[in-house]
Amino acid sequence: MSRAATTRMGLLEVRARRAVAGKGARLLRAKREVLASELWKLVHDVLEGRARLDEALHRAVKALELAKALEGEERLASLALPAARAVPLAVTVRRVWGVPTPSVAAPPLVRAADQRGSSPVSWGPSGADAARHHEESLEVLLTIASKELHLARLGEEIRETSRRINALEQLVLPALRSEASRIAAALDERDREDAVRLRRFRARHPRPA
């Protein structure tokens, strides 16, 4: 930080900068509190979502194993090929205290048997059940992915905000306080020297009676 002029105007300037930096640190702390509150809510949602995803995947794997046993892997593979599709995703961004956080949305993914690229009669009950469970798992996964992205973005912003707070409180504000003290001390010393010189001048040049 460059030194300010050792003048009363310089002292006022440094004190003004210190006030602005202090206000900035307080605002950043308030921002961090809001972001941390949002983050902890999201952590709870993500943990619940992961538990739901684990359950959905467990059901999907069990259903697939049963379908393989009853219908055979080759038949399931032949049904899976025409059932493949692209899933259109819509990514939107919302802001929390100016922090852009992405959100992922998709249309309903669970399809009826006649929407999977083959005649409904081609699907046995176990194969259709396995397909439905996997589509349900994908829906849960996309919901969690959106929250995970939001969580990661909030974590990054909280870390960046903490770095800025530390820089202000540990570097900028102490430096400004030190600079203000230096200027104030120099001005006081200058005032004392001026007072001494004035007394000497008056002693050498007394007023005529």
Swiss-Prot record:
InterPro entries: V_ATPase_D. The gene is atpD. NCBIfam families: V_ATPase_subD (TIGR00309). PANTHER family: V-TYPE ATP SYNTHASE SUBUNIT D. One of its GO terms (biological process) is proton motive force-driven plasma membrane ATP synthesis. GO terms for molecular function: ATP binding; proton-transporting ATP synthase activity, rotational mechanism; proton-transporting ATPase activity, rotational mechanism. Keywords: ATP synthesis, Hydrogen ion transport, Ion transport, Transport. Produces ATP from ADP in the presence of a proton gradient across the membrane. This is V-type ATP synthase subunit D. It comes from Anaeromyxobacter dehalogenans (strain 2CP-1 / ATCC BAA-258). Belongs to the V-ATPase D subunit family.
